[in-house]
Design a protein with these regions (language model features):
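Short, cationic-aromatic polyanion-contact patches
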Residues: 11-24, 38, 70-93
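Short capping segments at the starts of secondary-structure elements
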Residues: 34-41
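Glycine-centered, phosphate/nucleic-acid-interacting loop/turn motifs that mediate DNA/RNA or nucleotide
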Residues: 64
Length: 98
């Protein structure tokens, strides 16, 4: 599952740029501190309902902003750990730091 972490990614795709400008995306990306997190940990970090965080995580994975760092089985349930694909995402008009 290991993916290469990049220092910086420049986003030129309009759709990805729009996603990066959303407040929830900024909060999700800012909650990482050098360690991958589960969906529950992300939700707790940003005080967001766990049931709703999955939609946003799925969207960020589909747009190569987050990736699944690892998977493990905990009490019979597959638990995934997520991590940003870069430390800094740059759009033509702003930078978003993780």
């Amino acid at each position: 599952m290991t993916k290469t972490f990049k220092e910086q990614i420049i986003i030129t795709d309009f759709k990805k740029g729009k996603i990066l400008k959303k407040e929830i995306t900024k909060k999700i990306l800012s909650c990482f501190n050098q360690t991958p997190k589960t969906a529950s940990e992300i939700a707790n970090s940003i005080s967001f309902p766990k049931e709703k965080i999955y939609y946003h995580i799925k969207n960020l994975i589909a747009n190569d902003i987050l990736y699944i760092e690892s998977k493990e089985i905990v009490k019979g349930i597959e638990q995934k750990r997520f991590f940003p694909t870069a430390k800094i995402f740059k759009t033509p008009d702003q930078s978003i730091h993780t």
